Amino acid sequence: FKNMKLSNKYIAFASVALLMASCDLDKFPEGDYISEEQKEDIINGRPNLITAEVNAMAAKLNTFGTISDDATTYHNDYGIPAVSMILESGGQDLVALVNGYNWFNTSQNYSDRVYDSSSDELIWKTFYNHLKAANNVLKLIAADTEDSSLKVYRGQALAARAYDYLNLVQIYQFTYAGHENAPAVPIVLETTEPDVLSNNPRASVKEVYDLIEKDLVQAHSDLSSYQRLNSTYIDQTVISGLLARMYLLKE
């Protein structure tokens, strides 16, 4: 019985010690958490580790669940391919029956041309989520880096962001000529502070196109010596195509 009382005292003491330790919230997280500063230090020491952030950009292009949740599932919620179908269905050369499981029928009859349509939500969130992934990469790499691997990653992120804005500016405003000062879409950069995001008005068409051109020209320079493994990676040929498309749209 005496030994049991002693054991209970040890258990009580250990419980109090654990409780006190769990209440100490003033210490910096160690072990289980990695701060942004720690991540940046790691990447600067081992540039190859940033590939996870770069791969996230590609993953955002065809992800499921951008607008779906536990209450509602949209079967046309599968990223850029779905966005392409929405845009094609709004044209005159794609014919499909407006019944059954045609998830793009609202685009065919133009009833999705309202701000609260699921198609509009999918387009907006798909491009801005992909854009955020690109900004995450740019946030970790200094603009003046001389590291060859980091320059490639930065160039690919700049090209990805330009791709997003090139699509957004066409969808949410008329073409460039004659509409240079018309409101287009909000510009979000890697340097944009969180408190600005909730009060970030639409930039003009000219401002968006200027950013697209700036990003693509810099990306073209960053990828000057890059040889991609296959067509899933962004290289100078991709950027040249985007530049040509942008200049054509400005005419």
Model-derived features: positions:
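Sec-dependent bacterial lipoprotein signal peptides
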Residues: 1-21
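Membrane-proximal, proline-rich intrinsically disordered regions
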Residues: 6, 23-82
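Short coil/linker segments at helix-helix boundaries
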Residues: 171-210
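TPR/Sel1-like alpha-solenoid repeat signature
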Residues: 158, 240-246
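Conserved, well-structured interaction surfaces
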Residues: 96-172, 203, 220-226
